[in-house]
From Swiss-Prot:
Top class in the EC scheme: ligase
PROSITE patterns: AMP_BINDING (PS00455)
Protein name: Putative long chain fatty acid-CoA ligase VraA
The keyword Ubl conjugation appears for this protein: no
Family annotation (Pfam families): AMP-binding
CDD domains: AFD_YhfT-like (cd17633)
Keyword presence, Phosphoprotein: no
Stated family: Belongs to the ATP-dependent AMP-binding enzyme family.
Listed GO MF terms: medium-chain fatty acid-CoA ligase activity
Organism this protein belongs to: Staphylococcus epidermidis (strain ATCC 12228 / FDA PCI 1200)
Stretch forming the signal peptide: none
Keywords tagged on the record: Fatty acid metabolism, Ligase, Lipid metabolism
EC number(s) per entry: 6.2.1.-
Annotated GO biological process: fatty acid metabolic process
Length: 411
């Protein structure tokens, strides 16, 4: 039995009447969740050990129930986005040999001649996730149980208010929301989610429960929460993963939620958590302090010690489906970075680098500086061909101020 199943069963036995899942239209206690999982597992008796099962129900509660039910059958849940087209689902099923699909509590077989008959499944896999690229077919990857258990422990160290409720309003097909949900249920907490992100409705749910709360969000959600101007004293920790928040956003959060700690994470679906910034205590341009036991390498460093970031830790994934995976391998993030005093500084994506007269220019670094100018709403740096320099960088911005070349150069 997987450890997450053991953890869940412990809290089912200890606190059967405690709320486990809260969505706008569905609330389940730990006891009720247990019954739902058992009933679902009885419907899926055909699922065998290590067989892949696509979860594609429109309601996230059903997908959570089915996630654990598939585990009870020894299968591997595959986390689909219910908004994917039928064509995309068909391509994923064929490409990654997903033998079963579950939708509306119905198990459908997709058995066919598999290109992965001889595939070696990594140890202790808890699910298959998919990268969220905007083009092409999402890449399937294995998430192992140990990596998340280690991550849970690191999270517990950062929560300082004995939080009883974990909130993640994003779709469960996104690693952050699924992680937060399994984290909550593995530690006996209440999980609040949403079918579609609605900040006002979310505030009402949190206020109704009135428990110390940690909320896992991405920066666009942070901005929408700020826009509501709704104070919520129950929110004790805000954990943001994605783009670095601006100083202005941080100050707005402090004004709206003065009792809350803001913890910014840098990481990827593959590498999990790499660094964290607690209440913006790290240097201004960094993405935080490296987590303990995260090893780093900077490949192909230039004269400024900037190189391509690769990481290794107990929190990383177990590789892509269908590719040979080596335990303990280094994970390349695709970011140019440097490290100073255990703090990580990102200067740009490998694919975005502009070379101006032989000098590396990193648009992300420039955009970050421009966004710190008061009155700037958005900033974008692009490269265009140039006869003399090969490329030059062009800044596009919007806001209430007008910038000039000398001002930017001085800044």
């Amino acid at each position: 039995m997987k450890k997450i199943m053991e953890y869940l069963q412990h809290y089912i036995n200890q606190y059967p009447h405690r709320l486990a899942l809260v969505f706008e239209d569905r609330h389940l206690t730990y006891g009720e969740l247990s019954k739902e999982i058992y009933q679902a597992s009885m419907r899926y008796k055909e699922v065998k050990l290590n067989k892949k099962v696509g979860l594609m129900d429109e309601h996230p509660v059903n997908n959570i129930i089915n996630y654990f039910a598939v585990h009870q059958r020894g299968g591997i849940p595959c986390i689909f986005n219910h908004q994917w087209s039928n064509e995309r689902i068909y391509q994923l099923v064929k490409s990654y040999d997903i033998q079963w699909l579950i939708k509306d509590n119905h198990l459908t077989s997709n058995h066919d001649n598999s290109i992965y008959n001889d595939e070696v499944i990594p140890r202790n896999v808890i699910h298959i996730g998919f990268t969220s690229g905007t083009t092409g077919l999402p890449k399937a990857f294995y998430r192992n149980e140990h990596s998340w258990i280690v991550s849970f422990k690191e999270n517990e160290k950062l929560l300082q208010h004995c939080e009883e409720t974990i909130v993640a309003p994003g779709p469960l097909s996104h690693s952050l929301s699924l992680y937060a949900c399994i984290y909550a249920l593995s530690t006996g907490k209440t999980f609040i989610g949403q079918k579609n992100f609605n900040p006002l409705s979310l505030m009402r749910l949190i206020n109704q429960l009135n428990k110390a709360t940690a909320i896992f969000v991405v920066p666009t959600m942070v901005q929408q929460l700020i826009s509501t101007q709704r104070h919520c004293s129950s929110i004790k920790s805000i954990l943001s993963s994605g783009a670095k928040l601006t100083l202005q956003q941080f100050q707005q959060i402090r004004n709206l939620y003065p009792q809350a700690n803001l913890i910014e994470f840098f990481g990827t679906s593959e590498a999990s958590f790499i660094s964290y910034n607690f209440n913006q205590s790290s240097p201004a341009n960094s993405v935080g302090k490296l987590f303990p036991h995260v090893e780093t390498r900077l490949l192909n460093q230039d004269d400024d010690a900037v190189g391509l970031l690769a990481v290794r830790s107990e929190m990383v994934f177990s590789g892509y489906v269908g590719q040979s995976n080596q335990e303990g391998a280094w994970i390349k993030t695709g970011d140019f970075a440097y490290i100073k005093n255990q703090h990580l500084f990102l200067v740009g994506r490998e694919s975005d680098r502009i070379i101006v007269g032989g000098i590396n220019v990193y648009p992300t670094a420039i955009e970050s500086l421009i966004m710190d100018i008061e009155g700037i709403d958005e900033a974008l740096v692009i490269g265009i061909p140039h006869a003399k320099f090969g490329e030059i960088a062009i800044l596009l911005y919007s806001g209430k101020v007008q910038l000039n070349y000398r001002q930017i150069k001085f800044f």
